[in-house]
């Protein structure tokens, strides 16, 4: 994980630069594809995914080394052919894992976050899951295991394959001619993120679109059918942690409420979006219809609130980068504690931007707990001796958070008086 952390220190800034370029380009072209809080939500989601991976959260059900040990028939020598074969196997596995996520209720929960934005831009590519806590994806790499692809090769290619999917999350690139026949392009992926009936569950491939063409899931982007982005049941929140478990919580509620025992057992494995008839009738949920005007989620925010949200995002981003750069200095408990602090910080500031009634109290409590974390003798001694920069930064950040919350609270009270 230490190597992966160092790789991210280079990759993430590169992604952020590309996002800034896309924002500037959209501004000058008069075709802006970004909104303020949607972008912060996407970037925050990316941070939670990085933390989940770095902290090793999850349970591996079946690993690739296990499959390789028991299934390998061939033994490919190290060569360009080996790496090309391995990359094709990784892409093939990605297609079928992606298809499973789209088709089955339970697995959709861990993929919904990626489709949750009602925009389509490079930032939304960073909406990656933290709810994929069961490690079963290696099962789709059985062809690679049979061919004897070494685990080290898969370890190298897996992040390369993931990072290679970033560039095509954009509305600024049209169709790419002959490339459309064998590579996934922005046009094809716009289709994938759309909720238009003709586009639903189409274009599931990651790099090579031949899988979609062979297995019947390919759909070309049509001029007469502009893509509408998001999910059919809007998430209605900026909080990436809530989004990650929203669909799962809905299934838990349905399983509890339905009076039919077979439904309690099997609704998890039914097609995505399935709900028991008795529950669906008694507890209907909002679902988008393209026959009616669509109002995107965008709660009203004052300039002060936007400034406050951006301040928090900058500070949390700094904390994450400092954590990645000094990952080797942390013991496992300290890494979990600091990572947990970042998780809670993201949960808090995005909840306040949603306007939840409890969010102000939560944020105030988080800020005081953050101060306590850095002033507690055991922790303060560790940070002062090993990581003094983050120690002083933490004290300033959480102190300013408390002051900022008081100012926001005063603004809220003034607005209430004016409205009254």
Role assignments for model-derived ranges:
Residues 10, 33-50, 332-340:
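Loop-to-helix transition at the N-terminal end of transmembrane alpha-helices
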Residues 298-414:
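Substrate-recognition/cap regions that form aromatic- and gly/pro-loop-enriched pockets
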Residues 1-15:
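Hydrophobic transmembrane alpha-helical segments in integral membrane proteins
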Residues 2-6, 56-75, 138-154, 315-334, ...:
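Juxtamembrane "helix exit" motif at the C-terminal ends of alpha-helical transmembrane segments
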Residues 44-56, 79-240:
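Membrane-embedded catalytic scaffold of the fatty acid hydroxylase/desaturase
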Residues 119-123, 167-309, 358, 394-420:
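Cytosolic/stromal cytosol-facing helical appendages immediately following the last transmembrane segment
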Residues 14-24, 59-64, 87-93, 342-347:
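Central hydrophobic cores of alpha-helical transmembrane segments in multi-pass inner-membrane proteins
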Residues 20-40:
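Membrane-interface helix-loop junction between the first two transmembrane segments
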């Amino acid at each position: 994980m230490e190597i992966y952390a160092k790789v991210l220190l280079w990759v993430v800034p590169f992604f952020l630069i590309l996002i800034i370029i896309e924002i500037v380009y959209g501004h000058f072209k008069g075709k802006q594809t970004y909104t303020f809080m949607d972008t912060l939500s996407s970037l925050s989601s990316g941070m939670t995914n990085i933390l989940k991976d770095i902290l090793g959260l999850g349970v591996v059900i079946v690993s690739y080394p296990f499959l390789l040990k028991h299934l390998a028939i061939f033994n490919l020598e190290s060569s360009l052919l080996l790496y090309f074969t391995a990359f094709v196997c990784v892409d093939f596995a990605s297609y079928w894992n992606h298809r499973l996520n789209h088709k089955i209720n339970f697995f959709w929960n861990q993929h919904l976050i990626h489709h949750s934005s009602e925009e389509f831009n490079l930032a939304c590519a960073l909406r990656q899951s933290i709810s994929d806590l069961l490690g079963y994806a290696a099962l789709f790499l059985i062809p690679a295991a049979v061919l004897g692809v070494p685990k080290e090769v898969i370890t190298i290619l897996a992040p390369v394959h993931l990072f290679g999917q970033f560039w095509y999350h954009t509305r600024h690139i049209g169709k790419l001619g002959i490339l459309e026949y064998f590579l996934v392009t922005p046009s094809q992926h716009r289709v994938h993120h759309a909720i238009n009936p003709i586009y639903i569950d189409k274009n599931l491939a990651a790099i090579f679109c031949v899988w979609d063409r062979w297995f019947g899931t390919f759909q070309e982007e049509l001029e007469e059918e502009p893509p509408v982005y998001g999910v059919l049941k809007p998430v209605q929140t900026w909080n990436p942690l809530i989004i990650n478990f929203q669909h799962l919580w809905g299934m838990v509620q349905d399983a509890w409420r339905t009076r039919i025992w077979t439904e309690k057992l099997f609704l998890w494995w039914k097609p995505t979006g399935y709900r028991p008839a008795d529950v669906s009738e008694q507890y209907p949920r909002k679902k988008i219809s393209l026959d009616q005007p669509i109002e995107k989620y965008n709660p009203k925010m004052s300039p002060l609130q936007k400034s406050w949200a951006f301040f928090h995002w900058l500070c949390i981003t700094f904390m994450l980068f400092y954590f990645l750069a000094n990952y080797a200095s942390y013991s496992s408990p300290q890494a979990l504690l600091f990572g947990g602090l970042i998780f809670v910080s993201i949960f808090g500031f995005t909840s306040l931007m949603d306007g939840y009634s409890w969010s102000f109290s939560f944020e105030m409590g988080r800020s005081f707990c953050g101060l306590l974390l850095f002033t507690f003798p055991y922790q303060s001694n560790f940070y002062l001796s090993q990581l003094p920069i983050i120690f002083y930064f933490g004290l300033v950040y959480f102190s300013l958070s408390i002051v900022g919350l008081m100012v926001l609270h005063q603004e809220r009270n003034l607005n209430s008086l004016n409205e009254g």
